[in-house]
Amino acid sequence: RETITKAARADYRHKKQSGGAGQFGEVHLIVEPYYEGMPVPETYKFNGQEFKINVKGTEEIPLEWGGKLVFINSIVGGSIDARFMPAILKGIMSRMEQGPLTGSYARDVRVIVYDGKMHPVDSNEISFMLAGRNAFSEAFKNAGPKILEPIYDVEVFVPSDKMGDVMSDLQGRRGMIMGMSSESGYEKLVAKVP
């Protein structure tokens, strides 16, 4: 599992042009660590710039792997249509399932979408899903990400006839088998285990 330790912001523009209708979506968002009952500040400051937050809608999403994602729509003035918000959320969720730091599940994050841009013809759900996913990934990496459980590099020497049992046990503990070899009459398993 992974999470973040401080607030960060990111902007991402997804733009693809090919012959006919293209793809365009731009998302500006803020990520921050989340805990139960945490208030939403009225303003955030990053690099001397101030960002005013006007909460339009909040979704609290309990995650299957534990923790929560709190998604806040703070778009003012229609810079992104409300119909694209579910696509942005879907992009963020897909990145939380494969956290930006190690590929482990991310948890306990609040995301505030505060601005963006759309195109009357080229904007669609896919564009905003990708823009949301990539903006989240960029912001997450700048928000002091940390691993919530240690992952150990493990070498196990085991008799050949017990190899299957040991592999099953390691995988049952969410271990990832990285390699196998034979050494002095034993099988050697190399794995990463939480």
Feature names for model-found ranges:
Residues 1-194:
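Accessory interaction regions appended to the cores of large information-processing enzymes
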